[in-house]
Amino acid sequence: MPDYSYRPTIGPTYVYHNKYYKNLGSVIKKPKRKKHLVEHEEEEKDPLDNYMVAEDPFLGPGKNQKLTLFKEIRNVKPDTMKLIVNWSGKEFLRETWTRFVEDSFPIVNDQEVMDVFLV
């Protein structure tokens, strides 16, 4: 059985860890992949992604459902937009969303700022 104990007489000891080594192919292909992603990012943008739909959560699929489209104005984080909504207890999704807002918009008591995650 090999002896891995430290002995200063045998000179410096090195420990190699796999996490510091990368596949040569991935190192070479990474810039190419990045360039490809940047070039095709514009093509993959769907105009439908610029709109949000307010759906009534109490109506299941297949029932008559009134859809309201909202134009996206500003993104807060990658998957999030801030909305001002009328607030009335648990039924806030039934209310009409008043408008998209900027940070400078004054928030009134009966309105609540929400982050809506688009999943």
Curated annotation (Swiss-Prot):
The keyword Kinase does not apply. Signal peptide: none annotated. Coiled coil: none annotated. Keywords: Viral occlusion body. It comes from the Viruses. Pfam families: Polyhedrin (PF00738). The keyword Metal-binding does not apply. InterPro entries: Polyhedrin. One of its GO terms (molecular function) is structural molecule activity. One of its GO terms (cellular component) is viral occlusion body. Major component of the virus occlusion bodies, which are large proteinaceous structures (polyhedra), that protect the virus from the outside environment for extended periods until they are ingested by insect larvae. Belongs to the polyhedrin family. This is Polyhedrin. It comes from Antheraea pernyi nuclear polyhedrosis virus.
